[in-house]
C-alpha cells in the first residue's frame, strides 16, 4: 500500500513538472503585438493628444517632472527644452533581452534608441515616440523585425517587438498619469 502511494506521488510530481514545462514554453512564445505604424512614414509611432487642464507652462513643468521620474538620467535624454514654445525632445534608450534556449538564462539582446517628443499647449499636450533603432555600427530600424517574410527573420524579433511595445505602453501610461494636476488635500483637524 505504501509503495503504491509513493508511486502515485511520483506520477503526480512528474505530471506537475511536465505541465510546468509546457506552461513555461507557452509563456516564452510571444505573439507579435499590434504596434502602431504611421501610414505615411511606415515607421513605428506612438502618438496621441491628451486633454489636460493647465497652462502650457504648467504642463511643461509637469512634463519635466515626468522626465526626472521616468528616466534615470534625464539630462542625457534631453535634446530640446523649449519652455517658450512648449516643446521637449529627447533620445530615449531601452535594453532588450532574449532567453538562451540551452541555458534558460536571460541574455542582452541590444539597445534600442528612440525619439521622444512632447508638445504642450493650453489644456492639452501631444506625445510622439518614433524612430526606433537597434544601436549598431549603422542604423538598424526595428520595423524590419515586423517582416516575417524576410529571409533573415528570427523568432526572437517578436519578443523584441513585444518588449518595445510593453515598455512604450508603460511610458505612455506613466506620462499621462504624471501630467494630471496634483490634488491638494486640505488639512482638516
Give, region by region, the residue ranges found by the protein language model.
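Bacterial Sec-dependent N-terminal signal peptides
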Residues: 1-30
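Ser/Thr-rich, low-complexity intrinsically disordered terminal regions
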Residues: 27-189
